[in-house]
UniProtKB/Swiss-Prot annotation:
This is Threonine--tRNA ligase. It comes from the Bacteria. Belongs to the class-II aminoacyl-tRNA synthetase family. Homodimer. GO terms for cellular component: cytosol. Keywords: Aminoacyl-tRNA synthetase, ATP-binding, Cytoplasm, Ligase, Metal-binding, Nucleotide-binding, Protein biosynthesis, RNA-binding, tRNA-binding, Zinc. It comes from Verminephrobacter eiseniae (strain EF01-2). One of its GO terms (molecular function) is ATP binding. Catalyzes the attachment of threonine to tRNA(Thr) in a two-step reaction: L-threonine is first activated by ATP to form Thr-AMP and then transferred to the acceptor end of tRNA(Thr). Also edits incorrectly charged L-seryl-tRNA(Thr).
Length: 639
């Protein structure tokens, strides 16, 4: 007898080997129809998998995250099936699952067109409607290589050639199409109903620019028609909020071919950048951080000691001077340790908190660059806390409270907390890992935060907490982090004198709140659809006259406001152009200014202004003093 234990603790007995599908059918016809896969331990299995021993089994459906990932993976194969039917000369390569969908790379003699995508999607729907079974078989490695070479699928043969010779290779067939894959897959193509192909882009084979350029077809797939439509609607809204589009429309920045992956900030954009930086500088000052500044270029020897030269060199910009090799820093941590090492440090100095707005450079592939979100030169709100193991928990508690306040001020209230724990290959004792992971968890619990564990996703030298924002469209952005690191202080020989008079290694906590300022500003623009709150807006209000007769009055009002709000650095635009008032109002409204003030003869006589507030329309006539009070409160409270 084989005993299967289900998630609710109940057991089912079978006289001999049984498939996942048969177990699902024994529970009920509804589950049998909905079953996409099974899960034993951490392993996902096809519904055709034969169970030969007692186990705990979960049936995976499209209600599970794993089920949705399975749908997307299988839809990628369905795309390849359709492409091979439409374009038999195309060669298939790889087709993984990505956030919200999948892609598949093809080698073909000409670029795919938008009409080709329409044809592919139509053929996919036809193949799905046939509800063909998805069947698995296993071949010896060399037989699999010969099989795919015989089909003319040389990329697949190359992939398999990289697998050890004594291993078997699994293949999945649906109809006339068979592909290399570890699996699992949905039991039949009829499970794949709600998908859409999104775009085609270029991608080098194996990500190497020296190899052939392939065509990458992107798609999305969901468990229901409603979920697919909701996602497509979100994409439409995201397109309207695209920070690259807003950067042009609001005259904030641009990216130029003369310096790929770096930002040309325009006056208004640089004002926004400085406002974010100055806010974070006040955060440093008010929370016990000492601001420091390290050099841009550091010697190769230092990067060899930290391990970056071996593991990260391809992503570093390297230069040479007087027969010495240097690299532009991709991160600030080594510089902070060098500063820490100047002079003897005592346990009384700890925790010691350094912060830096350090400009970093990373040689990102050109295909991965994206506006100001993914760049090669960026400024990091980088901080490092030197402390003892016993101080980790209190530092996590303080840092989490700080993260929450900063995100709230910028308009984010939904934060997801994740704790990444030790990977299988790690350094340090199990006791030190237990202590660090416990300190992070207790710090989060003391902050009142619900969090999820990310088993095995910590760095090889220490665990970390990730702080992920959820924006107005429900998208997630991982910005904040705090990482426990006993390794780099060891590598660079950082020490402090303990209470016992002996020398000890400090623990280093790498921490960032907004991360890259450039990326965070991109997130801010998309969160607020360009309509930044008054305290952040590059221009907070425009003051307009109706005719020349009110010009002097507008100048007087502007001077009064600037004087009254000098402590807040009011950013006011005085527009006295001889244009129709409707034209001027429309122009400034398109720039998403928080306030537009208009002064005509009536307002001048009353010593007042007509106020228009973004999102609220005409607020009527208001005294100048009343408006000063209103905007001062809005800026100072970050409303």
């Amino acid at each position: 007898m084989i005993h299967i234990t289900l998630p609710d603790g109940s057991q089912r007995a079978f006289p001999g080997p049984v498939t996942v599908a048969e177990v699902a059918a024994s529970i009920g016809p509804g589950l049998a129809k909905a079953a996409l896969a099974g899960k034993i331990g951490d392993q996902l299995l096809d519904t055709s998998h034969r169970i030969t021993a007692d186990c705990r089994l979960s049936i995976i459906t499209d209600k599970d995250d794993a089920g949705l990932e399975l749908i997307r993976h299988s839809t990628a194969h369905l795309l390849a099936y359709a492409v091979k039917e439409l374009f038999p000369e195309a060669q298939v390569t790889i087709g993984p699952v990505i956030d919200n969908g999948f892609y598949y790379d093809f080698a073909y003699q000409r670029p795919f067109t938008p009409d080709d995508l329409v044809a592919m999607e139509k053929r996919m729907a036809e193949l799905a409607a046939k509800d063909e079974p998805v069947l698995r078989r296993v071949l010896p490695r060399d037989a699999a290589i010969a099989y795919f070479k015989g089909l003319g699928e040389h990329y697949k043969a190359e992939i398999i050639a990289g697998i050890p010779g004594d291993e078997e290779v699994s293949l999945y067939r649906e109809g006339s199409f068979e592909d290399l894959c570890r699996g699992p897959h949905v039991p039949s193509t009829g499970k794949l109903k709600f998908f859409k192909l999104m775009k085609v882009a270029g991608a080098y084979w194996r990500g190497d620019h020296r190899n052939q350029m392939l065509q990458r077809v992107y798609g999305t797939a969901w468990a229901s028609k409603e979920a697919l439509q909701q996602y497509l609607t979100m994409l439409e809204e995201a397109e309207k909020r695209d920070h690259r589009k807003l950067g042009r429309e609001l005259d904030l920045f641009h990216i130029d071919e003369h310096s790929p992956g770096t930002v040309f900030w325009h006056p208004k954009g640089w004002t926004l950048w400085q406002e974010v930086e100055q806010y974070m500088r006040r955060v440093y000052r008010d929370n016990g951080y000492q601001e420091v500044k390290g050099p841009q270029i550091l010697d190769q020897g230092l990067w060899e000691k930290t391990g970056h030269w071996d593991k990260y060199r391809e992503n570093m910009f390297v230069t040479e001077s007087e027969k010495r090799d240097y690299a532009l820093k991709p991160m600030n941590c080594p510089g902070h340790i060098i500063i820490f090492k100047q002079g003897i440090k005592s346990y009384r100095d700890l925790p010691l908190r350094f912060g830096e707005f350090g400009q970093c450079h990373r040689n990102e592939p050109s295909g991965g660059l994206h506006g100001i979100m993914r760049v090669r030169a960026f400024t990091q709100d980088d901080g490092h806390i030197f402390c003892t193991a016993q101080q980790i928990q209190s530092e996590i508690l303080a840092f989490t409270a700080l993260v929450q306040k900063v995100y709230r001020d910028f308009g984010f209230t939904d934060i997801i907390y994740k704790l990444a724990t030790r990977p299988e290959k790690h350094i340090g004792t199990e006791e030190s890992w237990d202590q660090a992971e416990h300190a992070l968890a207790q710090g989060l619990r003391a902050s009142g935060c619900e969090f999820e564990y990310l088993p095995g996703e910590g760095a090889f030298y220490g665990p970390k907490v990730e702080y992920t924002l959820k924006d107005a469209l429900g998208r997630q952005w991982q910005c904040g982090t705090i990482q426990v690191d006993p390794n780099m202080p060891e590598r660079l020989d950082a020490e402090f004198v303990g209470e016992d008079g002996a020398r000890h290694r400090p623990i280093m906590l790498h921490r960032a709140i907004v991360g890259s300022l450039e990326r965070f500003i991109g997130i801010l623009l998309e969160q607020h659809a360009g309509a930044l709150p008054a305290w952040l807006a590059p221009v907070q209000l425009a003051l307009l006259n109706i005719t020349e007769a009110q010009s002097d009055y507008c100048r007087e009002i502007a001077a009064k406001m600037q004087k009254a709000l000098s402590h807040l650095g009011l950013r006011l635009l005085l527009d006295l152009r001889n244009e129709k008032i409707t034209y001027k109002i429309r122009e400034h409204s398109m720039q998403k200014l928080p306030y537009i003030l208009v002064a005509g003869d009536k307002e001048r006589a009353a010593g007042a202004v007509a106020v228009r507030a973004r999102g609220h329309g005409d607020l009527g006539v208001m005294s100048v003093d009343a408006f000063i009070e209103r905007i001062a409160d809005e800026i100072s409270t970050k409303a």
